[in-house]
UniProtKB/Swiss-Prot annotation:
Cofactor note: Binds 1 zinc ion per subunit.
Name used for this protein in its record: Histidinol dehydrogenase
Gene Ontology MF: a single term: histidinol dehydrogenase activity
Pathway membership: Amino-acid biosynthesis; L-histidine biosynthesis; L-histidine from 5-phospho-alpha-D-ribose 1-diphosphate: step 9/9
Residues binding Zn(2+), per UniProt: 265, 268, 367, 426
Organism expressing this protein natively: Pseudomonas syringae pv. tomato (strain ATCC BAA-871 / DC3000)
Functional description taken from the UniProt entry: Catalyzes the sequential NAD-dependent oxidations of L-histidinol to L-histidinaldehyde and then to L-histidine.
Group of enzyme by EC: oxidoreductase
Binding site for NAD(+): 136, 197, 220
Length: 448
């Protein structure tokens, strides 16, 4: 006999619901002191000793016997070789996914713009891609080629000149799918290094690893902590927490589908969060039964069970309107609207990393091949953050080109404001360009 699931049950009608929900959502992402200090030591070593430190740390943490950085560099030919080592079906899937991701992100490209005022002054914005981006990819058997596509393709679409990938190969384990994905995505350089030391190398540069402008990509607590510390020296994408899925269902979807959708995120790790919200209490019972029945069939059953029982929940609400309220409160990474008319509810969704609309749109499709990016804000940060995209690899510069007439008119306003702030250098710089002698006589002699 299968033991019933121990997943948490909440009811929005409970007077303590808000408190219980806050407790469910709480997750501490801050590194402990020992991790923090180890990361600081690693960053210091890489900054001071460059390649030598990378070689030593790779030997220590990845169990590799390497004598120099030359052994930790993969040439383009090795990426092309990986394409021949995966199956034709795998290559076709990677290429199709890459094509869809590229097509979607092409639509995110921003163009420079400008306009001319009546006096000839030109104002505008110049959009420029980053020179170099660094992509961190977890290594070993738990590698994710889809992450390579999702991080590298937007950078290349943005026009980044060089994409540098770092991927650890613990005990010499190389994932051919990851290298094949790097080849398809157009990654320019690959180093087989990982951990905090790889992040430090990308941020500060070494004799072999070029310094980048931005570091993106997922990693463990050491990688995340290193990204926190190098932020400011370089840009970063985000500090990602555990994966999350929130399913809002009207009770009409197959319970097995919903259970498996919850599993799709719960299988990532024990801290992942999978939540179902529905106004149908009987449907929640059916999904709970599906969870119990399907759990033993999962390859990562132990991880799924820990996640579901520890951080998962089935939440009963009064109606669909309240379900949407709860969804906005949670601000999930992935939100499935498994309802009859998702378009009707879409305008009411304010906070979600990605929104999967309709019963047939499983979150897994977004993870791999739908097209939108799967690098999404977690831990409620969808309230103020967005998915990774082309815009993360472009920067904007303001353009101001004053005509003599424009400089004269703007100078009057600038002079008054600058003198109001007691910044006479600013004021005089603007005033030198004012051609209206009457204005100068009437204002500057009065010390204004």
């Amino acid at each position: 006999m299968t033991t019933p699931t121990a997943i948490r049950r909440l009811d929005a009608a409970d007077p303590d619901f808000a408190r219980h929900l806050d407790h469910l959502l709480s997750w501490e992402s801050v590194s402990d002191d020992s991790v923090n200090q180890r990361v600081l030591d690693i960053i210091k070593a890489v900054r001071e000793r460059g390649d030598a430190a990378l070689v030593e740390l790779t030997q220590k943490f990845d169990g590799l016997q390497v004598a120099s950085m030359a052994e930790l560099i993969l040439p383009r030919e090795r990426l092309e070789l990986a394409l021949t080592r995966i199956t034709p079906v795998q290559r076709q899937a990677l290429e199709k996914a890459a094509e869809r991701v590229r097509s979607y992100h092409e639509k995110q490209k921003q163009d420079s713009w400008s306009y001319t005022e009546a006096d000839g002054t030109v104002l505008g914005q110049k959009v420029t891609p980053l020179d170099r981006a660094g992509l961190y990819v977890p290594g070993g058997k738990a590698s994710y080629p889809s992450s390579v596509l999702m991080n590298a393709i937007p950078a290349k679409v943005a026009g980044v000149t060089e994409v540098v990938m770092v991927v650890p190969t613990p005990r010499g384990e190389i994932n051919e799918l990851v290298l094949a994905a790097a080849c398809i995505a157009g990654v320019d350089r690959v180093f087989t290094i990982g951990g905090a030391q790889a992040v430090a190398a990308l941020a500060y540069g070494t004799e072999s690893v070029p310094k980048v402008d931005k570091v993106v990509g997922p990693g463990n607590i050491y990688v995340a902590t290193a990204k926190r510390h190098v932020f400011g020296q370089v840009g970063i994408d985000m500090i990602a927490g555990p994966s999350e899925i929130l399913v809002v269902c009207d009770g009409q979807t197959d319970p097995d589908w919903i259970a498996m959708d919850l599993f799709s995120q719960a299988e990532h790790d024990e801290d992942a969060q999978a939540i179902l919200v529905s106004p149908d209490a009987e449907f929640l019972d059916k999904v709970a039964a599906s969870i119990t029945r399907l759990l033993p069939t999962m390859a990562r059953a132990a991880i799924v069970e820990t996640s579901i029982n520890g951080r998962g929940a089935l939440i009963k609400v009064a109606d669909m309107a309240q379900a949407i309220e709860v969804a906005n409160r949670i601000a999930p990474e992935h939100l499935e609207l498994s309802v009859a008319d998702p378009e009707a509810w879409l305008p009411h969704i304010r906070h979600a990393g990605a929104i999967f609309m309709g019963r047939h749109t499983s979150e897994a499709l977004g993870d791999y091949c739908a097209g939108p990016n799967h690098v999404l804000p977690t831990s409620g940060t969808a309230r103020f953050s967005s998915p990774l995209g082309v815009y993360d690899f472009q920067k904007r510069s303001s353009i101001i080109y004053c005509s003599p007439e424009g400089a004269s008119e703007l100078g009057k306003t600038a002079s008054v404001l600058a003198r109001g702030e007691s910044l006479s250098g600013h004021a005089r710089s603007a005033e030198y360009r004012i051609t209206d002698l009457d204005w100068k006589t009437g204002n500057l002699e009065e010390g204004k």
